[in-house]
């Protein structure tokens, strides 16, 4: 029997699980858009080191979470303060075998709650314009496109979403 998904703050020991979940989500949802699996863009070891460096910098202005199921990390989220009143959801990735389990909603909820607890009034995020699945998810969760766009360093155009935190 599969256990339910639980969410907790990320810690240094989560590095390998964090990177595996991130890579699985990337390869399922973004590789078809970008044209490359994540492993071709950065080594596993480099991504682990980057995660560990980020965790060491977590504070009220930046935090991360993992979603676990059956003692395995299946999803990740990270937010950082963008300005005095705005937080940015920098990452929300769930491995495809955990899609539909509520992991994404739970991770998003943890990030939004932390932003509220830190006095932020608004949240923003960037998502690939062609990432229809992610865009539908964010729209269902109350996010709206604000008209801003940018060229991602990997090629695809990204659009910005916003939502209030009240």
PLM regions and their residue ranges:
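Active-site acidic-Proline motif in GNAT/NAT acetyltransferases
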Residues: 95-97, 101, 129-130
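Intrinsically disordered, low-complexity regions enriched in Ser/Pro/Gly/Gln/His and often acidic
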Residues: 19, 58, 119, 136-138
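Generic detector of contiguous secondary-structure segments
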Residues: 8-10, 15, 120-128
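Short polybasic/polar patches that bind polyanions
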Residues: 99, 116, 139
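Short acidic-aromatic loop segments in the C-terminal HATPase_c
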Residues: 93, 143-144
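C-terminal "cap" of GNAT-fold acetyltransferases
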Residues: 3, 121-135, 140-141, 147-166
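Short coil/turn segments at alpha/beta junctions that flank glycine-rich nucleotide-binding fingerprints
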Residues: 101, 118-121
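Acetyl-CoA-dependent GNAT
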Residues: 5, 9-97, 105-114, 149-151, ...
